Swiss-Prot record:
The gene is mndA. The lineage of its organism: Eukaryota, Fungi, Dikarya, Ascomycota, Pezizomycotina. The active site is at E462. GO terms for cellular component: extracellular region. It catalyses: Hydrolysis of terminal, non-reducing beta-D-mannose residues in beta-D-mannosides. It is found in: Secreted. This is Beta-mannosidase A.
Length: 914
């Protein structure tokens, strides 16, 4: 690489479109990868990881195959050098043989002035980046006598220990749903930028904050106030005195210019230039989440000019006008009068409207981020939209999501609850660590602030709800100390930094919290957390809930009653097709060594390769759940039996999530006024047992189909107390206006014959359900029904109603179907439904028909080498009923031949030997 010795900077991170001259993308350069662990070099790439380059060079097999997460540990335990910057891990950087800098935070953007080094460089410049072994580095830090030591039994180690000392993706060190590859490498792009003269700048980052006049993060904005735009640009270089700024908003659909104006109050502070303007006299179209309105977007162009009107910087970002607010305020007298229980709110409001948040938690989609493409994430987010989800909680500790992922969410109306990267651990609070965190927070808050999909900033995952109670239980004498450290990091440090860089987003110190008592931004601890200051009979905060005692999985009395459910779930196995991507044929049985050791629930707690005791507990939980509630597979062919067992675990998982989601959604009309359900978890990081609804590669589990169904706007739900026999039917709606209609109740035996007198229940029940509410439409006790044989009976519930979707004048017809059986599926007197499947080449749809009996959990499956989803799946099909079902192809490597491999089965097939 040859450069002129003018002002030059190494910049590591994504780079915005600006007027910076001579920008060289280092991804286009030739790189080599070397290590003492190898006796030769291999070609490298940027961005990349050592694992990926070694795989491409043929040095290693697929890291995801078999037990390679164990076999390839020599890679993360070695040092690696990329020669010829998002810079990851602790790594010295050399340019022209001269030391440039060391970095210690994967989440920051770094820029370095190398002009003097370049000026003295008499040879072709060589850039060298050394990556130390992350596991070795954190262990060395832990052994330093000056490093903090926490009480025994507090810190959560999954595989590699001491992750909390490094600002690196925490799940790189292992988690209970993923491997511990701890990859090293330049995981984001890097650039060399040359500025040809003084008073010329290059844009590093942009903060565009759009909010209502007078808006404060933790208070509801006044929707009658005009919009305010605060535009701030971070740069390298130097600005001339008294620069000017202007903005232009252009509708991305129509191309119409909303407004174009010069910004007043331009200030320069350090390497940032900022201007603020009020958009008076304009009425932009609002951005709404999925199902609540349109996703109206605008391109905002910010231009910085000098005193002679020459353009110094020019940045265009896509944005939207919306307010999003997490309401944690005390319940008002007006709410009490409506029957809402006392305590405090915990729900989101968009553009002044409270709404029901329906969604899940997203984890890293891959252990190696450089191979996560926009197309791959688009497929995932299309599945989110198809699943009727309007919010994802971006779990920490993965990474702060790339801008292109926020772009995908902006387009699709998916709100992203975002978090700072701290999870299930206590962290250092020394000055150097806090300074590092401060830079990380400021960079990322500013970077993503223009995205209308951004819903919240939370301080971290389960710090308040898990870590502090663990300290209180195991080291009560030190509880006050660690509460103080928690507040120092998450409240005294991070909260003010968020407030200083955005007025449009609420901040919560922890993902699961009881909320706050008071906010005083002038106080040393600006937010007073509620902690244990609660009153019996009152509700506060959000909940997470995991109970692996499957004997109570369908007992709604054990589910937490709260304002918002942000985590809940149970694990299941991926499908046979997904297992076959990573596991050898001889290992395709439920308790093979490979299958068991790829299950990290429960985690090893260290770098053990014989975690059979802990993993057998998790495998046993799935096994016992299936045995309790579903027919036990016993097929003669071992692979077919393995596949049937995998499917059975998915049936249990889906039914359990359905039971909980119905309960939480019903809470919208209960005293708890519950307004959110985000289950754990959306997708997988690799092929293994987990809580995911979408497998690695994109195949939907039963869960994602079932959650899509139960996340529809209006649903009918049965609630059965199997101890007392009480059966209640509810209609729940998340519309913003009342809706009315009827629910048909049809009792049948499993051959499809109607039961006499409809078993003593009415044939239909009318309903009128209020806005964002629920209503009980029928109540009885199973003992009062005239059921000839409870094992040979099913109640089919069919809802039809009318209402208006939010922000729509058009009346819409809503339908939903549910069912109830008076015994659990394993005790049903199943009959062969006689399923037949056909395909129409013209309409490209499948038709499924049940010829001889009720088909429960009707399941269409497709072969490997294609990715997509059916319009409907895991449904009830009655005798003589035909259902036409389409299939959305997201990726096809079969040239259309996959159609020939589509199959259909039902719960009946789980009872067969073949």
């Amino acid at each position: 690489m040859r450069f002129t010795a003018t002002a030059a900077a190494l910049v590591a991170s994504s780079i915005p479109a600006t007027l910076g001259q001579h920008v060289r993308d280092l991804s286009n350069e030739k790189w080599t990868l070397s290590s003492d662990a190898l006796n030769h070099t291999v070609p490298g790439n940027l961005p990349s990881h050592a694992h990926l380059d070694l795989l491409k060079a043929g040095v290693i097999d697929d890291p995801y195959h078999g037990l390679n997460d164990f076999n390839l540990r020599w890679i993360p335990e070695s040092n690696w050098t990329y020669t010829t910057d998002k810079i990851k891990d602790l790594m010295p950087i050399e340019f022209c043989g001269k030391y440039v800098a060391s970095t210690n935070n994967q989440y920051r953007q770094y820029s370095f002035d190398v002009s003097q080094i370049l000026e003295g460089c008499n040879e072709d410049p060589i850039l060298k980046i050394d990556f130390g072994s992350a596991p070795n580095i954190v262990n060395a830090i832990a052994e330093d006598r000056n490093s903090p030591v926490w009480p025994d039994g507090i810190q959560q180690t999954y595989e590699y220990p001491n992750r909390w000392f490094m600002r690196k993706e925490q799940s790189d060190f292992g988690w209970d749903w993923g491997p511990a590859f701890a990859p090293a490498g330049p995981w984001k792009p890097a650039y060399i930028v040359q500025l040809p003269k003084a008073q010329n700048i290059h844009v590093l980052n942009t903060d565009l904050d759009i909010y209502r006049k007078g808006q404060i993060n933790h208070l509801p904005p006044d929707q009658s106030q005009p919009w305010v735009v605060n535009a701030s640009i971070d740069f390298v270089g130097s600005l001339p005195p008294n620069p000017s700024m202007s903005i232009e908003f252009k509708d991305t659909k129509s191309g119409e210019i909303l407004t174009s104006k010069r910004i007043g109050n331009v200030t320069v502070s350090g390497n940032s230039v900022t201007g603020v303007t009020v958009l008076g006299g304009v009425t932009p179209k609002l951005w709404w989440p999925l199902g609540l309105g349109d996703q109206n977007l605008y391109n905002i162009t910010v231009t910085v000019t000098g005193h002679q009107n020459q353009t110094l910087a020019h940045v265009t970002k896509r944005t939207g006008f919306r307010t999003i607010f997490l309401n944690q305020r005390n319940i008002t007298d007006a709410q009490l009068a409506q029957g809402i229980a006392p305590g405090a709110n915990w729900h989101f409001e968009v553009n002044g409207h409270e709404f029901y948040a329906k969604g899940s938690n997203i984890i890293p989609p891959d252990a190696f981020w450089p191979r996560v493409t926009e197309a791959r994430m688009a497929r995932l987010f299309d599945a989110v939209v198809a699943g009727n989800q309007n919010m994802l909680r971006v779990w920490s500790s993965g990474i702060y999501l790339h801008d292109f992922i926020y772009d995908l969410a902006d387009e699709r109306g998916i709100l992203l609850w975002s978090e700072f990267e701290f999870s299930d651990a206590l962290y250092p609070v020394d000055d150097a660590f806090l300074d590092n965190i401060a830079a990380e927070v400021v960079y990322n808050v500013r970077r993503v602030n223009h995205h209308p999909s951004l819903a919240l900033w939370a301080g971290g995952n389960e710090i308040e709800s898990l870590m502090l109670p663990t300290v209180e239980r195991k080291a009560p004498e030190e509880y006050a100390k660690y509460v103080g450290e928690y507040e120092k990091l998450y409240i005294s440090l991070i909260l003010p930094l968020v407030y200083q860089n955005t007025r449009s987003i609420t901040y919560s110190p922890s993902s699961t919290t009881e909320g706050y008592l008071d906010v005083d931004l002038s106080a040393p601890v600006p937010m007073v957390e509620r902690y244990h200051n609660t009153t019996p009979g009152s509700y506060y905060g959000d909940t997470d809930f995991y109970n692996y005692d499957s004997s109570v999985s369908f007992n709604s009395h054990v589910y937490p009653v709260g304002r918002f459910a942000n985590e809940f779930g149970y694990h299941s196995m991926p499908s046979l097709q997904t297992w076959q991507q990573a596991v050898d044929p001889e290992d395709l049985h439920f308790n093979s060594t490979t299958v068991m050791l790829r299950n990290h629930h429960y985690p090893a707690g260290g770098t053990f390769t014989d975690n059979f005791h802990n993993t057998s507990l998790g495998m046993g939980e799935m096994t016992i759940a299936v045995q309790r509630y579903y027919p036990i597979p016993n097929k003669l062919d071992s692979v077919a039996n393995f596949s049937a067992w995998c499917h059975a675990t998915q049936l249990f998982q889906a039914d359990m999530y359905k039971s909980e989601i119905q309960f939480y959604r019903r809470g919208s009309g209960m005293p708890e006024r519950q307004l959110g359900s985000l289950y754990w978890q959306l997708e997988d990081i690799w092929q293994a047992p987990s809580w995911a609804g979408i497998e690695y590669g994109g195949r939907w589990k039963v869960l994602h189909y079932v959650s899509r169904d139960i996340y529809q706007p209006i649903i009918v739900s049965p609630f059965w107390n199997y101890t007392t026999g009480d059966l209640d039917l509810y209609v729940t709606s998340d519309l913003w206006e009342s809706a009315k209609g009827k629910v048909n109740l049809t009792w049948l035996d499993l051959s499809g014959t109607p039961l006499p007198h409809n078993a003593g229940t009415p044939g239909s029940v009318p309903f009128n359900v209020g806005a964002l509410n629920t209503t009980k439409i029928y109540s009885t006790n199973i003992k009062n029904l005239t059921l000839p044989n409870p094992k040979d009976a099913i109640l089919v519930l069919s809802l039809s109603g009318e209402g208006h979707l939010p922000n729509s004048d058009k009346k819409t017809t809503f339908t939903h179907q549910n069912h109830f059986t008076p015994v659990f599926p394993k005790d049903l007197a199943l009959v062969d439904p006689g399923l037949e499947l056909s395909y129409n080449t013209k309409s490209k749809t499948f038709t499924v028909e049940a010829k001889s009996g009720v088909s429960l959990y009707t399941w269409l499956d497709y072969p490997a080498d294609v990715v997509g989803y059916f319009d409907e799946n895991a449904f009830v099909l009655l005798p003589g009923q035909k259902k036409e079902i389409g299939f959305t192809v997201q990726e096809d490597n079969t040239d259309g031949k996959w159609v020939q491999g589509v199959t259909v089965q039902s719960l009946w097939n789980q009872t067969l030997e073949k």
